[in-house]
């Protein structure tokens, strides 16, 4: 059938819609500078950081962003857009990774730790990381929001023209201008103990660097300092605070018995520090020699040599807090902590890289560097002579020296602990542990099994022995795992949250390991002639709230406690229990002096009657008449005479201590220098192998 003729449309033509206005292609260069400012702001707000330093990290972010923004301008529009999306995703991944590291491990990690991270097994932290991912999902979405919007909308709203060449020059100039403006603000007259200018010239205090300078600048400075280490800015005003006359400053140590004549000569060695300073190979060695030469040594006392010739077993207990000790649930820990030396003001502050640098304090008597390289690992990499470590001191005295850890080679311990002087055994190098069908460690390893599978190495030795255990059962996360299972009925009856119940089970496992150890020593007839030393490496920082339940106290808001924000928490969260015990002790010895992990090595060296030089350690013999001091990672500190808050720059005298304002100002100024010196000396000792200059390895 023929269709009827249809006439063409004779009505009004409808004009097509005008093209959507698009932004010039060169405006894409603004994205990365603004993204970095956004990411820094989200990171700071999420971490509860002070925003007063926003101008600094905003300017440095704009500078770095302008430089990266060149990748958005130099090529064709499609390549520019894809490169920008890729860089946006990578930068966001970097920020979220650092955010999660701070949330779970209480530390930001610079790029120089990548080698360590690659060598470690993140499976140890997988449960905590997955939990943190889930708990912070809304924040992670906020981090990634700009990248998602860019990927979806950039092509739609940008022209397809090639950006003019002069736009690249504009952003390159912007990078320089913003960087110079950032430096100007950094060197403005900021107040405080750690100013932006001081942090900018330093490779330590990473958390403060992130807060004041920004994450991007911390990472940039880290890369710079890998090739150009910062020069020391320490002065040589080595005056020490005067000897206190206040109660408690001498330690308030109650003697076991009165000794008619006590040798109170200084614990020093016959070394020529002045001569070393004069002939030093560099400024750092000269500074160290002069500093140690000016330091007042601690004196021998009525406890010197109390355990001379004893076997020595030292334990660093993973994630341990004395708030968990209970006479019924942990009877062995209770017995040892109440029947030996009883330390009422002992602290285990959380320093950089937690366990590794908890060991640094305990084994070296030195505060760890608050940054990279990781101190304990570095000693193994360099082969630094740890002359005063118990392993070396007792090894020179003819002891059998062994060390054990129920894990893989984390933080390079096979090298570092062998270098300390231990015959080191861990999984894969001589220590047998339960494994899975695939041959991996049945995680976590049981502390009781580590004791059971190692004790025969030394228990029947004809020579004295020194054994070091780094335990593992208390490793986070605190969930119903193979460590908790044997104690499940007991802990589920406790009036705590499930996390706290599970944490208690890990402490019970450490308690049973100690019980087994004492039983083995007693059966071998070695118990009365053995000194037991035990401390935590750090508190359970991933779940510090459990300590509020166990102690019945409040240490800060939930957010501040979760982040261990030292500007807002009660430092008693770090209060802990130090065990120094022998079955030969007739009665306990109460010690009220302020002390911490670095004090263990000199205290034990004196108790064993070893020859050591007390000037060359950051710790002090707790049982001597020296003033007690505990330094926290933020550089706040507590001494026998009071507490100094670095954030408020205020000093609160201890109970019973009276000072005029002038005396207080002089004391605080002097102590702040001592704190700086004790923190700064460690990397110089390690990097220059300082002890080896005085005591060359044979």
Regions found by a protein language model. Give the residues of each.
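Transmembrane and membrane-interface helices of multi-pass
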Residues: 2-268
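Alpha-helical scaffold segments in carbohydrate-active enzymes
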Residues: 92, 196-200, 271-274, 513, ...
